[in-house]
Amino acid sequence: MRPKKTILCVDDNEQVLSVRTFLLETRGYRVVAVNTAQEAVEMLERSLPGTLDLILCDLLMPQMDGNELVRRAKQLHPGLPAMIVSGTVNAFDRALHADVFLPKGASSPAEMIERIRVLVARKRGPKKATPPATTQPPSVPSFAHATAS
């Protein structure tokens, strides 16, 4: 059995955080749920590289928005994929540093789970391809033919 992927989930709305945590855990993910971006930064500072597989956060939060949180997360963990979800969808509020932006209400939970699956797989890197078996004739030693003069 493959180890569970760990998602740092950040939302200042406790109800949204609870629902999102439940959704992810029932799909087999391990969730670290926090209510503030500052808590998330502290978690990121304490975590070893590779221990988190994705950060999923709200765009609009008090003290620090999702863009700033993702920017800091990527400074601390450069390969960490990030998804921002928000109910506000205007050009100025779009996620600048996230790999994926999903508007709340315009995307289904199934779409969010699929995007998470793709991001986590991308973090892991492409599947290692096995080199194709080549059928070459066995090498035959070559002998220099001496010509009699």
Which residues does each PLM region occupy?
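Conserved acidic segment of CheY-like receiver
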Residues: K4-Q15, R20-L24, I55
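Acidic, metal-coordinating helix/loop segments flanking the phosphotransfer/catalytic sites
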Residues: A33-L54
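Active-site residues of response regulator receiver
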Residues: D58
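Receiver (REC) domain active-site loop signature in two-component systems and cognate sites
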Residues: M61
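C-terminal output helix
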Residues: G105-V120, R124, K128
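CheY-like receiver
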Residues: A121-S149
